Amino acid sequence: MSMAEGDTLISVDYEVFGKVQGVFFRKYTQAEGKKLGLVGWVQNTDQGTVQGQLQGPTSKVRHMQEWLETRGSPKSHIDRASFNNEKVISKLDYSDFQIVK
């Protein structure tokens, strides 16, 4: 994966609120993450939200954050998304973007 000069690797946790379970949200999130070349994970929570972690170049992570806030899967209805624990990382902790059961 080639990175633009100065495109720092970052890690950020996310949680998406709204109608995001039972609408293939995790599958679409995984596909979008892979398309952008990001790594991390996504899972459903007992509270009816979807949460996970994104890692990759800052510009790609920003694109994915916007996607999580505004797009999601076709049948989802996103109320809001929260992002926490953003930090610069020296290397990726994952080799893939996974759906966690």
From Swiss-Prot:
Enzyme class, top EC level, equals hydrolase
Q: Which residues form the Acylphosphatase-like domain?
A: 11-101
Q: Which residues carry this modification: N-acetylserine?
A: S2
Instruction: Tell me where on the tree of life, at the top rank, the source sits.
Output: Eukaryota
Q: In which tissues is it expressed?
A: Organ-common type isozyme is found in many different tissues.
* Keywords attached to this entry: Acetylation, Hydrolase
Instruction: Extract the InterPro entries matched here.
Output: Acylphosphatase, Acylphosphatase-like_dom, Acylphosphatase-like_dom_sf, Acylphosphatase_CS
Q: Which reaction does it catalyse?
A: an acyl phosphate + H2O = a carboxylate + phosphate + H(+)
Question: Which Enzyme Commission numbers does its entry carry?
Answer: 3.6.1.7
A single Gene Ontology MF term assigned here is:
acylphosphatase activity
Q: Which residues form the active site?
A: R26, N44
Q: Which PANTHER family match?
A: ACYLPHOSPHATASE, ACYLPHOSPHATASE-1
Name this protein carries in UniProt: Acylphosphatase-1
Gene expressing this chain: ACYP1
